[in-house]
Swiss-Prot record:
This is Ribosomal RNA small subunit methyltransferase G. One of its GO terms (molecular function) is rRNA (guanine-N7-)-methyltransferase activity. Specifically methylates the N7 position of guanine in position 527 of 16S rRNA. S-adenosyl-L-methionine binds at G93, L98, V144, E145, R163. It is found in: Cytoplasm. It is an enzyme of class 2 (transferase). The keyword rRNA processing applies. The keyword rRNA processing applies. The gene is rsmG. One of its GO terms (cellular component) is cytosol. It catalyses: guanosine(527) in 16S rRNA + S-adenosyl-L-methionine = N(7)-methylguanosine(527) in 16S rRNA + S-adenosyl-L-homocysteine.
């Protein structure tokens, strides 16, 4: 056994992850059924399995995946409630399916579409859709600025969200044509992105900026909602 192997932390059991998820969801005010918790844990296992080959995330430890990916994604759920129980959402630059897969599990009445330009990531997303039996989840590969409502995607979206896609101004510029009337763009950010906000294009403005607290995560997190003149 090598020194590195001796120092490697033990892999958390499913029971440990389940307890962490239950406590975290409760702290966030997100109600999850047993089936939803099970699906989220299955997703962590799937992400860890495929990550070895597809390099979906720099995080390798399932416990940290649950904190930094699952709980982080769940933290935005309470703030999306204004869009109702049956909204349509687009996750841009979804990568390994974050936050879109988590939203599809936590909000089963929503129709969630994952978007990425990398085919191997879309392949994983489709695998997650199949294995987790997420009938409300769709996958579309391609650049977001080229997606056409009624052709590449069924229609415009009430919510367009991104977790780690681009500068806020670029995100808004590239995705604004896909926002439905009354809809908005939501960007998950780390530190407060004041400089990015200052570069927002004409017709776009911050509706609200929410400081998020993610259980077990010692990092600054913000959720920015941007509204557009043409979507009002």
């Amino acid at each position: 056994m090598t020194v590195q192997q001796r120092r490697r932390p033990p892999i958390a059991s499913r029971e440990t992850l389940q307890a962490l998820l239950s406590e975290g969801a409760q702290a966030l005010g997100v109600a999850l059924s047993d089936a939803q918790r099970s699906a989220l844990l299955d997703y962590v296992a799937l992400l860890a399995k495929w990550n070895a080959v597809y390099n979906l995330t720099a995080i390798r430890d399932p416990r940290q995946m649950l904190i930094q990916h699952i709980l982080d994604s769940l933290s935005i759920v309470p703030h999306l409630g204004a869009h109702g129980a049956a909204a349509a959402a687009l996750d841009v630059g979804s990568g390994g399916g974050l936050p879109g897969v988590v939203l599809a599990i936590a909000l089963p009445g929503w129709r969630v579409t994952l978007n990425d330009i990398v085919h191997k990531k879309s392949a994983f997303q489709n695998q997650a859709k199949a294995e987790l039996k997420l009938g409300n989840l769709s996958v579309v590969t391609g650049r977001v600025e080229t997606l056409r409502p009624g052709a590449d995607v069924p229609a415009k979206f009430d919510v367009i969200v991104s977790r780690a896609f681009a500068d806020l101004a670029d995100f808004v510029t590239l995705a604004r044509h896909l926002v439905a009337p009354g809809g908005s763009i939501w960007a998950m950010k780390g530190v407060r992105p004041d400089e990015e906000i200052g570069r927002l294009p004409d017709g776009a403005r911050v509706k609200q900026m929410i400081r998020l607290t993610v259980p077990s995560l010692d990092a600054e997190r913000h959720l920015i909602e941007v509204e557009l003149d043409e979507a009002i």
